[in-house]
C-alpha cells in the first residue's frame, strides 16, 4: 500500500480587511477555504488554477509560513498543526521539521539576497541547522551546485552575475542541501524563458529520482502539470473542485471549470482551438464570493441548487473527487 507523506485536511486561511478607508465594517477574505488532499510518498502532486485562486497561500500555509485559520496538516506521520484541537509544533520543533520540508520560490530574482554571495546563500540552511560550517559547508554547497548544473566557483559570485535560469538552479541547490523529503515548487519555472523551462523541469525530475523526493507543484501551466505530475488538484477561488490522477483528470475533466482550463492549453490543432471553452464573466471577489457553488456565476450548466448549496468534494470513483452538483448530467 502506498504511504502518504502529507495529509491536508479542511485547511483554511482567512484574512479580515476593512471595507473602506473610513468604514468600521470589515470583510473576510477566504483565501484558502476548506482545502483537503493527500500526497503519496515519492509522487509529484500538482495544484493548478488561475492566478489569485489561493494556490501559493495554500503552499505557505502548509509549511506554517502563514498562520492557518483552520484545519490540520500532517507530515510524515507527525502533526504539524491541528487548529481545532489546538495542537501545534513548537517553534524549535517546526524549525527542525522545515529541514525536511523545503520550498522553491517563483521569482529567481527576488528570492536571492543580492548582498550575499552564492556560497552564503546556499550554506545558510546548513549553518542554521548546525549541519556543517566553514569549508565543510562550502564543499556541500559546491556539490549541490554541481548537481544543479553550476560550477563550483559559483560560490564566490553574487546573484546579479547569473541569468534567471541559473538563479533558479541556485534556489534549487539551496533547497536540496538540507536533504529534504518534500519540496514545494511555487511556480518554479513560470518566470523563465521557454527554452530554460524544459532544462529546469528535467533537472527537477532527475533530482526527484536520485533523492526519492516528493513534490507539491503550484502552477497555472497545465501543459507542464500534465507532463510532470502524478496527481492533480484543480483550485477555484480558494477551494478545490476536482482531484484525480493526472492522466485520468486530463481525459475525464468532469468539472466545467476544469474543462475550460484544459481547453485553453495552447495547441496547433485548429479543431481543438475551434472548440475552446470561453468562460463568461470575471472571477468573483474572494471577499464577496457568490452563495452556493463559487463557480455558478460563470457556469453554463448552473441550476437552482448551484446557487443555494455549496457542493461537497465527493469521491465519484476510486481516488477521483469532484465538487459539482451536476457533474453526472454534464458528462
Language-model features, listed with the residues they occupy:
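Helix-to-loop junction immediately C-terminal to a conserved catalytic motif
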Residues: 63
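P-loop NTP-binding/switch modules centered on Walker-like glycine-rich loops
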Residues: 50, 188, 192, 196-274
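A short, proline-enriched helix->beta-strand linker immediately N-terminal to the Walker B motif
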Residues: 177-181
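Charged, flexible cofactor/metal-binding loops and thiol motifs
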Residues: 4, 18, 22, 245-331
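Conserved ABC ATPase "signature" region
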Residues: 79-82, 136-153
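Conserved ABC ATPase signature
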Residues: 158-162, 166
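Conserved ABC transporter NBD signature motif
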Residues: 71-84
Amino acid at each position: 500500500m502506498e504511504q502518504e507523506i502529507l495529509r491536508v485536511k479542511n485547511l483554511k486561511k482567512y484574512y479580515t480587511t476593512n471595507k473602506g478607508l473610513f468604514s468600521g465594517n470589515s470583510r473576510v477574505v477566504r483565501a484558502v477555504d476548506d482545502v483537503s488532499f493527500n500526497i503519496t510518498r515519492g509522487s509529484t502532486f500538482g495544484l493548478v488554477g488561475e492566478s489569485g485562486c489561493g494556490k501559493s497561500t495554500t503552499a505557505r500555509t502548509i509549511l506554517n509560513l502563514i498562520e492557518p485559520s483552520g484545519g490540520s496538516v500532517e507530515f510524515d506521520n507527525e502533526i504539524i498543526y491541528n487548529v481545532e484541537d489546538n495542537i501545534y509544533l513548537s517553534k524549535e520543533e517546526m524549525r527542525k521539521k522545515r529541514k525536511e520540508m523545503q520550498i522553491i520560490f517563483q521569482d529567481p530574482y527576488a528570492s536571492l539576497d543580492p548582498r550575499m554571495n552564492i556560497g552564503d546563500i546556499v550554506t545558510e540552511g546548513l549553518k542554521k541547522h548546525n549541519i556543517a560550517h566553514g569549508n565543510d559547508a562550502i564543499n556541500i554547497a559546491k556539490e549541490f551546485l554541481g548537481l544543479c548544473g553550476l560550477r563550483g566557483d559559483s560560490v564566490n559570485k553574487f546573484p546579479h552575475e547569473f541569468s534567471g535560469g541559473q538563479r533558479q538552479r541556485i534556489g534549487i541547490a539551496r533547497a536540496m542541501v538540507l536533504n529534504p523529503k518534500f519540496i514545494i515548487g511555487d511556480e518554479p519555472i513560470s518566470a523563465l524563458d521557454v527554452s530554460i523551462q524544459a532544462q529546469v523541469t528535467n533537472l527537477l525530475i532527475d533530482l526527484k529520482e536520485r533523492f526519492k523526493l516528493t513534490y507539491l507543484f503550484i502552477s497555472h501551466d497545465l501543459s507542464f502539470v500534465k507532463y510532470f505530475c502524478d496527481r492533480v488538484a484543480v483550485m477555484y477561488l480558494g477551494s478545490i473542485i476536482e482531484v484525480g490522477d493526472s492522466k485520468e483528470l486530463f481525459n475525464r475533466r468532469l468539472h466545467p471549470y476544469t474543462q475550460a482550463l484544459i481547453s485553453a492549453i495552447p495547441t496547433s490543432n485548429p479543431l481543438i482551438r475551434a472548440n475552446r471553452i470561453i468562460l463568461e464573466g470575471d472571477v468573483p471577489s474572494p471577499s464577496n464570493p457568490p452563495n452556493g457553488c463559487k463557480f455558478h456565476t460563470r457556469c453554463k450548466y448552473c441550476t437552482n441548487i448551484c446557487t443555494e448549496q455549496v457542493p461537497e468534494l465527493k469521491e465519484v470513483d476510486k481516488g477521483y473527487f469532484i465538487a459539482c452538483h451536476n457533474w453526472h448530467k454534464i458528462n
